[in-house]
């Protein structure tokens, strides 16, 4: 099975790129780290009091994510889909069977960490580095529509999340991968994809 990790700050286009890749391949599946936030009372309380909670590792349910990741990797199938509800702070589970999986795409703000802990075999890593203002516009539109935030709150949360994303890797040495690509606004995506699948 081919593993692809896609990382980048909020609003950089990770989900869009993942869907574009899925459209070009057969038997692929996307695991979004956005659907693996912790739930329950403690998580609800922390989300109120910890600044940038959803951008920090303490919010990520790594155990549940790893369980699903390993199941797909070991069996080549997925039997359920998870979707995190940001307003209710719950994970909805849906039965959705996918068989003969040949490509597993992990995308989200925690994908970089996941690639270093779960990518113990050959994998490709794509990091999106997109203009900050462009990312902020996308996040505001999404948060107004899907997450019930005011424009001011969406702006403030984005600026904090941007800083958190880049600060958490500032002093960490992350092993370089031979199949690592940096995606900017000027990148020819089709060329990158052709290298991924050659």
Report residues per predicted region.
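Conserved nucleotide-sensing/catalytic segment adjacent to the nucleotide-binding pocket
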Residues: 29, 43-88
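NTP-dependent small-molecule kinase module
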Residues: 98-101, 141, 163-198
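ATP-dependent NMP and nucleoside kinases share a basic, alpha-helical "lid"
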Residues: 92-148
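Short beta-strand-centered segment that lines the nucleotide-binding/catalytic pocket of NTP-utilizing
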Residues: 27-42
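Hydrophobic anchor at the beta1->P-loop junction of P-loop NTPases
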Residues: 6
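The conserved Walker
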Residues: 10
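Conserved lysine of the Walker
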Residues: 14
């Amino acid at each position: 099975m081919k593993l692809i990790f896609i990382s980048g700050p909020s609003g950089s286009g990770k989900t869009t790129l993942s869907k574009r890749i899925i459209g070009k391949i057969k038997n692929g599946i996307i695991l979004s780290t956005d659907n693996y936030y912790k739930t329950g009372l403690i998580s609800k309380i922390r989300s109120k009091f910890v600044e940038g909670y959803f951008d920090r590792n303490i919010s990520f349910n790594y155990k549940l994510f790893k369980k699903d990741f390993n199941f797909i990797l070991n069996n080549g199938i997925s039997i359920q889909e998870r979707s995190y509800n940001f307003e209710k702070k719950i994970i909805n589970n849906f039965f959705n069977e996918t068989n003969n999986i040949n490509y597993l795409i992990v995308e989200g703000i925690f994908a970089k960490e996941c690639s270093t802990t779960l990518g113990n075999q050959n994998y490709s890593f794509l990091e999106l580095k997109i203009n900050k203002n462009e990312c902020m516009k996308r996040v505001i539109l999404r948060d107004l529509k899907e997450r019930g935030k005011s424009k001011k709150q969406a702006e403030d949360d984005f600026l904090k999340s941007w800083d958190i994303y880049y600060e958490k890797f500032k002093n960490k040495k992350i092993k370089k991968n031979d199949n690592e690509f940096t995606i900017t606004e000027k990148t020819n995506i089709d060329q990158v994809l052709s290298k991924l699948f050659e």
